């Protein structure tokens, strides 16, 4: 993805504290908001999990361990406390969060709402949260051979904003077991990393990032340090009401690593060093609008962003198992009871509607993009990180590096919009300036709800209903619906299915498969490999 810089304007006592971090403060008790989500099985039954979310350490007050004196104010460190990276980590503490009042974060049952601007005793901009398995560990998702489904409402996200849901290869405990300088851990949202190898993090690997710190020239709250935090990133969803993309970003290592200076590459390094790091900062992306399908996604279009909808992402392996090699990433939607196939590319040289190795190579060639995706392992490398387990990130942000034009406008701005790959959405090239977006759209927000995870074909047919009611028990189950309306971008067919027919895009065959082997009306059971056939 492009730069992930979720910025905020001055928190009363401190701003944008650590992201892999030091000691624990005692001024505010940390209480994680609850969030239910479901795991599903191949027969369509789903079990509700009583989870919780934690805000990233970058949003927290960080202060001296011996007082309420800020370690970091504005976009500068207090050099009397933070004389070097190691000393700073020992001298500074993260404190608890007040989620709704300070950050505009609320939950209700399975629904998480993130407000863009929250005006409390100070002004907060955006947020980044992680799903937890317990009070001290992040939930790890192993995506291979599975599908991940959620409902989203982007109707209140204008040009320049990004409601992003994605996975990164963070440590489950936030780094406490590996780095003795990190006492806060996942409970306080530490350990962040992504494919941009972000250098705006205040703490990495249990040490501060104050050495070589340079305050930002266009943001009063941020800066760049000598170190960055790198790891593989699977952007399942980056979107506003105008455009969306899903993108795979592999890295050379399946685990988080620390990098130095401009050799980190990515958004935070000098332009000539963008591709000098160990990760792919561009990734292999699928944006229907960028691929010429300009009538698929947006207000009043096939996927109508005026209303909530369900996003389904499938991670297909060569043998249909969770231990196979990643070969394809598929997308479909459910809205108003209709299953909607992903908007296909309109370019003859870039075929299909999913991410495959062939798609990535042909897209890079057509758009003239440097193919660093293959350099860092391609889909197979992305799959290796998935096999290890990845942490779910839920966020809302604006973009001080590129005004989000890479998502929803013409980018680069000095290229003709008629050049393949330049047009990414209908937003003006003058849009997305953070100061303008924050002033004109302070009430923007995104909601994520009804998160489900399970074998391919197990989640979405029961996940299209709206609502966020809380389950009474972590062991309660819901049963997959047995009828739906089916829709592609060119053809619509309706009819009831039964337990003897697989749903649209569901599994319908393969070695060891015991479910239905026929498809609902309008769909054909299509052979993918010896272990997997799908209704297409």
Swiss-Prot record:
Highest taxon of the lineage: Eukaryota
Signal peptide: 1-21
Swiss-Prot/TrEMBL induction comment: Expression is under the control of the xylanolytic transcriptional activator xlnR.
Pfam family name, one: CBM_1
Keywords: Carbohydrate metabolism, Cellulose degradation, Disulfide bond, Glycoprotein, Glycosidase, Hydrolase, Polysaccharide degradation, Secreted, Signal
Source organism: Aspergillus niger
Role, per record: The biological conversion of cellulose to glucose generally requires three types of hydrolytic enzymes: (1) Endoglucanases which cut internal beta-1,4-glucosidic bonds; (2) Exocellobiohydrolases that cut the disaccharide cellobiose from the non-reducing end of the cellulose polymer chain; (3) Beta-1,4-glucosidases which hydrolyze the cellobiose and other short cello-oligosaccharides to glucose.
Name used for this protein in its record: 1,4-beta-D-glucan cellobiohydrolase B
Catalytic residues identified in the record: 233 (nucleophile), 238 (proton donor)
Keyword Signal: yes
């Amino acid at each position: 993805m492009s730069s992930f810089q979720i910025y905020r304007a001055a928190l009363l006592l401190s701003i944008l504290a650590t992201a892999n971090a030091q000691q624990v403060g005692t001024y505010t008790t940390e209480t994680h908001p609850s969030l239910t989500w479901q795991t599903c099985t191949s027969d369509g039954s789903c079990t509700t999990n009583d989870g919780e979310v934690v805000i990233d350490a970058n949003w927290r007050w960080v202060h001296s361990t011996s007082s309420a004196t800020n370690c970091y104010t504005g976009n500068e460190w207090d050099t009397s406390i933070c004389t070097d990276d190691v000393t700073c980590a020992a001298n500074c503490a993260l404190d608890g969060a007040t989620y709704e009042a300070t950050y505009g974060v609320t939950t209700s049952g399975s629904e998480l709402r993130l407000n863009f601007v929250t005006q409390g005793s100070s002004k907060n901009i955006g947020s980044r949260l992680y799903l937890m398995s317990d009070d001290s560990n992040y939930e790890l998702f192993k995506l291979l051979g599975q599908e991940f489904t959620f409902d989203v409402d982007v109707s209140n996200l204008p040009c320049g904003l990004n409601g992003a849901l994605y996975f990164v290869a963070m440590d489950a405990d936030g780094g406490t077991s590996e780095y003795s300088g990190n006492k806060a851990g996942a409970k306080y949202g530490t350990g962040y990393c992504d494919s941009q190898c972000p250098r705006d993090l205040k703490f990495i690997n249990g040490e501060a990032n104050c050495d070589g710190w340079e305050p930002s020239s266009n943001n009063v709250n941020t800066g760049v340090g000598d170190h960055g935090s790198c790891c593989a990133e699977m952007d399942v969803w980056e979107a506003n009401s105008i455009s969306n993309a899903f993108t795979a970003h592999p890295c050379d290592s399946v685990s988080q690593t620390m990098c130095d200076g401009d050799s980190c590459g990515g958004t935070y390094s000098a332009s000539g060093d963008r591709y000098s790091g160990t990760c792919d900062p561009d990734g292999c992306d699928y944006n229907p609008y960028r691929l010429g399908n300009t009538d698929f996604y947006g207000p009043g279009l096939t996927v109508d962003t005026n209303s909530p909808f369900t996003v389904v992402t499938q991670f297909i392996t060569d043998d249909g198992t969770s231990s196979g090699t990643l070969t394809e990433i598929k997308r479909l939607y459910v809205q108003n009871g209709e299953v909607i196939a992903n908007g296909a590319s309109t370019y003859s040289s870039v075929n299909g509607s999913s991410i495959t190795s062939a798609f990535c190579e042909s897209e890079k060639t057509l758009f003239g993009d440097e193919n660093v995706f293959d350099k860092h392992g391609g889909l197979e490398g992305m799959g290796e990180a998935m096999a290890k387990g990845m942490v779910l990130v839920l966020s809302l942000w604006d973009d001080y590096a590129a005004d989000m034009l890479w998502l929803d406008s013409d980018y680069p701005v000095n290229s003709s919009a008629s050049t393949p790959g330049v047009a990414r959405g209908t937003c003006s090239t003058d849009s997305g300036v953070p100061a303008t977006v924050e002033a004109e759209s302070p009430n923007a927000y995104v909601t994520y709800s009804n998160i489900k995870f399970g074998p391919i074909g197990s989640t979405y047919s029961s996940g299209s209903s709206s609502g966020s009611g809380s389950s009474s028990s972590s062991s309660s189950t819901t049963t997959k619906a047995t009828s739906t309306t089916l829709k592609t971008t060119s053809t619509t067919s309706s009819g009831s299915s039964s337990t003897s027919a697989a749903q649209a895009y569901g599994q319908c065959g393969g070695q060891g498969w015991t479910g239905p082997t026929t498809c609902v009306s309008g769909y054909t059971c299509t052979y993918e490999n010896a272990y997997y056939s799908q209704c297409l």
